[in-house]
Amino acid sequence: MELFWLEHKKLWRKKIVKICVLLCFVYCVIFGSILWFQWFGFGSSDDYTSAFGNNFDGYTVIKDSQEYALSFGGELTDETLQKIVSDYQQMEADGMEEELEKTDWQIVNSWLGTLYPELRDTSNYKTMISYVDPDKLTGFYERRQQVLDEFLEVSGQVGAEKEFLHQIERKVEKPFRYEWVEGWSTLLGSMVADLGVVMALFLGIVLSSLFAGEWHDNTSALVLTTRNGWGKIALAKILTGLAFTVEFFALLAVSNVISQLFFMGTAGWDMPIQNIKLIAVAPMNMLQAEIYEYAFVLLGAIGFAGIVMFISAAVKNNVLTLLLSLAVVYGPMMIAEYLPYKMQKALDLIPLVGSSTDIFRTNTFRIFGKLIWSPYLLITIPVLIGILCMPFAIKSWSRRMKA
């Protein structure tokens, strides 16, 4: 335990570590959460050409939007949808531009485009919500089921796979609860979902020197002469890397959640994620989806940390270690679109390469003839890969130290 605390303090004392943590905090929490809620994302529009033209009043806009959504009764039915669209059209006709900003018009417009494509007027430059006849917006859930079936057919997900996905979808409670959706859509679609991709960069910088730095700092001879030996020190380094990863994640996640609670409160936590993407099959509400996405980031970060520490133990050069570590995450992202679909899915199992937004999709894996919904594997396989790398990191470092 003493060795662990020594290694832990040694890591946190490094200037590069403090700089990385600070930069990531500023990017993910200050800009990606606080200023996004208050200014870039939800501030009232003053200049429609840029988010930077928004007013610094996001908190007020969010609260007004939540209050407005509650006026529609809390359940999403045909009548609710008709009333939302009718109310929007009336405000638009009255020239109430500022009032339109508190509506869920972007979300509702996506529903209309998905469920009522025959009502789209290609000659009209306006969005569907502005001109569609509210009285024709009927059969919401029947149409959703039809669209889902058509999507699965087009995707080649038929037979047993289609029935498997339908079994998952049947657990979704209907009618859907309805409150303000846009905030949760932004939160789950980018704020939390992109956290792991950003963390990977800074984790790579910090952990790449954990083992390789012993040669860079000319301390390898000192490690060989210590009474504890390489084995215990290697274990202490592994535990230090894991502890730093968890602490780093906790700092970002807790700060983001505090920001979220301040701006959004808990309103809408029990809405189904189908309000964001209608053809999603996951029986999850917004809170459950957020918990999954944070778990995805944490477990993916632990898995990535294991890979970085293995590379650091196997390579003496800090820069090469960093480049190889970053290539593990960003390399597959860059080449994925040029690969066959099955290979893309396989690459998604690499830590922090896949996306937590798979809960909105219908992807599956077939392993030994058994169908498995992709989010289950995306949250387990990456951390297992990292854990498996850790013993090899110790052995690799051992061989180099003895040599």
Predicted regions and their residues:
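Junction motif at the cytosolic side of a transmembrane helix
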Residues: 5-7, 11, 310-314, 381-403
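Hydrophobic transmembrane alpha-helix segments characteristic of membrane transport
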Residues: 214-221
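Central hydrophobic cores of alpha-helical transmembrane segments
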Residues: 22-25, 319-332, 350-351
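Secretory targeting signals
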Residues: 28-83, 133-214, 235-314, 318, ...
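N-terminal Sec/SRP start-transfer signal
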Residues: 1-23
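Residues that define the loop-to-transmembrane-helix transition and helix capping
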Residues: 18, 231, 318-320
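Short hydrophobic, aromatic-rich alpha-helical segments embedded in or entering the lipid bilayer
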Residues: 343-364
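Short helix-to-coil transition segments within interhelical loops
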Residues: 224-230
